[in-house]
Amino acid sequence: MEEKFRPPTWIRFNSFYNASRSCPTRASLLTGLYPHQAGIGRMTFNDNLPGYRGQLTENGVTIAEVLKEAGYQTGMVGKWHIAETPLKSDQREWLAHHVYHEDFADKACYPVNRGFDDFYGIIYGVANYFDPLSLVNGDIPVRNVPKDYYITRALSDSAVSYVNRYANADKPFFLYLSYTAP
């Protein structure tokens, strides 16, 4: 498959080094920038400093945005965790599903608005494996899951589904799969 979709200026990255925690590493991996240049120098809380906004900067272009512009289909499955996720006043009630909020973060920061055609996964970094709080499909919250739901299996199934759909298309695809641990 690599030969079939090899662009004229193919680049293979052999190494990726980053000493940060999960969100800063994700931001760096997706943008090719140092975490603070991507806007997530610490975690997904806004520290009111340019490099520590808690979400990707507008000028930090994601690999999905670049590949989409080059004609690729782009999909993401799994843990996003690079959008500012402010604490709600009723956070504990929300986590226990006793109250419901429509958005988990600014939707402009969701994967489908940062270069990914498709997204199935969680916006927050925390996840209950059996009933994840911030589960979305595209940018629509998934409020109910089956009783036998297990997020790792669901993410794997979704990734396989995307690969099967993309592989039958006439253009190359990029799939970013990010499981929830850690």
Feature map (PLM): residue ranges:
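Formylglycine-dependent sulfatase
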Residues: 1-182
